[in-house]
Amino acid sequence: MPRQDTSGRAYDLVLYGATGFTGALTAAYLASHVPQGCRWALAGRSTAKLEQLRDRLAQSAPSCAELPLLRADSGDPGSLRELAADTRVLVTTVGPYLVHGEPLVAACAAAGTDYVDLCGEAEFIDRMYVRHEATARASGARLVHASGFDSVPYDLGVRYTVGLLPEGVPIRVDGFVRTNAGFSGGTLSSALTAASRPVAMARAARERQRVEPRPVGRTVRAPFGPPVRSGETRTWGVPLPTLDPQIVARSAAALDRYGPDFRYRHYAGVRRLPIAVGGALGAGAVCALAQVPSARRWLSGRLEPGDGPSPERRARSWFKVRFVASGGGTRLITEVSGGDPGYDETAKMLAESALSLAFDDLPETAGQVTTAVAMGDALTSRLQEAGIRFGVVQE
């Protein structure tokens, strides 16, 4: 079925959840980076908060003084259907997505509207695939989850790295991420929601596996293994049980360029073994506490949604992801790096993902797709122009 024609809609792009911590950062980035003539709007539950945000944006970007404000609520599916029907691309920062996300995904899938989010919740993404993939494919909607620090640096970083290796050969990539950044209440809330549901997460993954096509004649793996010592990066690698390896594997399954036999492993890179062990134990303790309702409420209360690191703290933050790759007799190390990953750079990644969907000449895709599949090199170029670095460290 051909993609729905959305060119006559009122807006090119709508940002939903604009008044939250990450949403406001994304709005500020868009205010200074949307191309001339872009028709965009802010959306959320509270008109008063949207007006306050618009006033702040207009102080540095006077053109925002007349920015349209749209009221919508995740508890009112009708308002979300109207939102989706009025725009070509809909960006949402409203989480936890397991709690608030599905009505908007459903609305976009039905309307043929491109959808972009920051979701790092594997269960949610798997459930959305099972429930809305067919509808989105039929309408032409591109449903692009994980368009922030989860999982853009890894997804595009591996695509960039694979492009430097010979074609048609088995490829191995190990990713090592290092950062000094803090996190917000919204991020903590989403992480605790996901960590508290291991059984439901496993069930959603099995349901997806039953219906999702597998690559024919090719092997794609993203195994979870023990800690490793990397001589190339001079770090210990602590396996990270995050969404990112799944996203990388889905890109590899969709793109033949990743070779006939592709494997990706994902680690937190730390300099000293005691830190590696402590980090693994700490993550395990948080996951265990998340199973206990009273402990989960206590952890959630450490930061309220809408809270986050100060501008000064974010200015000191950084991330680096090194990829150790081999294939066809070639071995190399690449790196993706930038500033504050959780907020400043995430807002940049999310906004540029939406702008790429709205304005770039992209491959024809539909349904639930990754950033590497939907936007690929176009988004990598955008992020490089915006200051996120992709490069070869060692060949």
Residue ranges and their predicted role:
Residues 53-64:
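Short, conserved SAM-binding/catalytic segment
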Residues 35-49:
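Conserved glycine-rich Rossmann-like NAD(P)H-binding loop of the short-chain dehydrogenase/reductase
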Residues 29-37, 255-256:
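A short, Lys/Arg-enriched amphipathic alpha-helix followed by its capping loop at the start of a domain
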Residues 97-210, 243, 250:
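Glycine-/Pro-rich loop/turn segments that contact NAD(P) or position catalytic residues
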Residues 12-31:
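N-terminal Rossmann NAD(P)H-binding glycine-rich loop of SDR-like oxidoreductase domains
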Residues 2-6, 163-395:
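C-terminal catalytic/substrate-binding lobe primarily of soluble NAD(P)-dependent oxidoreductases
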Residues 12, 88-89, 114, 332:
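Structural motif
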Residues 70-89, 93-99:
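Conserved Rossmann-fold cofactor-binding substructure of NAD(P)-dependent oxidoreductases
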